[in-house]
Structures are given as C-alpha cells and as structure tokens.
Amino acid sequence: GYGMAEGLMEAGCEVVIVGTSDKVYDVAKGFCDRGFKCHGVKADFSKREQVYQGFNDCVAALGGDLDIIVNAHGIQRRHSAEVFPIEEWDEVLNVNLNSVFILCQEAAKIMLKKGYGKIINIASMVSWFGGQTVPAYTAAKGGVTQLTKELSNDWIARGVNVNAIAPGYMATEMNSALLDPENPRYQQITERIPANRW
C-alpha cells in the first residue's frame, strides 16, 4: 500500500491513505514533508460502519471527488483449516472481501455519475494456487478476483475501469512470520520465484 500511494503521488495525485492506528497520520505527514499532497484517515475495515465512515472521510479530504481508488488493505490469520477459528474467518472476510465490495460500490456511485474512474483491487496469487494455513485469506482473495471481473463487466461501458493486481509474496509486515530464511516455508516459496527472492 505504501509503495502504491507513493507511486500515485509521484505521478501527481493527491492521495488519502487509510490505517487502523494513529500511525497513519505520521505516514501522511512524512509524505507531506516530502512535498506530496497526502491525507491520513483512521478506520478499522473489520467494522462495517467504519468502512462507510472511512470512505466518506477520504472523499471529504479530497474535496468531494474521487478519480482512483486502490483497495490494498488486508489482514492475515494463520491456522490449519480444520482448526481455523470462525471468528477469525469472519474478521478476514470482512476486511479482505466485504469492505472491498463496499468501497468499490461507494466509489462507483461517484465515478459513474461523471463517467470516469479507476478502481484497482489487490488480489493475490493464492487466488489461483491456494495457500497453506490461510483458508480465509485464500477465500477472500479468490472472491476479490471474481468480484473484480464482475464489477468490470458491469461498469466498463460506463467509463469505470475495474482491475486487480495479484502480486506474489511481498516482504511486508503481514508476511513477517515467513521472512526468516531458516523457515522451511520461506525456502519453499523462494524456490518457486524465478528471481529467487521476495
């Protein structure tokens, strides 16, 4: 998310970043200190009312308009499928899929009126090959992939592009448990990456 926000600002966009803690304000200030136009909004996308409020706060920060939305947020919970807690399943699906639909829907209400907009959803390679000990994440990202296709079919003729990017493993905080080179899973993942690195 950080890199995508930075890239959009480097291209001249005014950007709103969303985070679950007050750290989002420090990150936004850091971008502003570098000469970018950036705003921070705090919201917990596991809570439906905060998804709507967070979206409204973002649009307000941008003066009431929206051209591009990137749904790059997500969480991860790791358990074998047979013992995966249903509460964590619900949390992951709420953040990684349900909030994506709500944000796409709310963005489209603005974009369709003006006949222009770009919606970019972050899916995952697990949408195709599955994962290990991440059934909720895999289900959610598979849902994002299919949802993106459906929304694209619905809105492209009216000027709103909807696409998904499905990156492989990235060295992020969410994957910190896998980043230890001594971890056998790290080796399995790295061996199937052509560049042999994350």
Locate predicted features.
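Conserved glycine-rich Rossmann-like NAD(P)H-binding loop of the short-chain dehydrogenase/reductase
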Residues: C13-D26
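Alpha-helical segment proximal to the catalytic Tyr-Lys
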Residues: K109, N153-A157
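Canonical Rossmann dinucleotide-binding motif of NAD(H)/NADP(H)-dependent dehydrogenases/reductases
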Residues: G1-V16
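Substrate-binding pocket helix/loop in short-chain dehydrogenase/reductase
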Residues: V51, S80-A81, P85-L93, R185, ...
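Conserved NAD(P)H cofactor-binding loop of Rossmann-fold oxidoreductase domains
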Residues: A72-R77
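Residue(s) in the substrate-gating loop at a strand-loop-helix junction
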Residues: S124
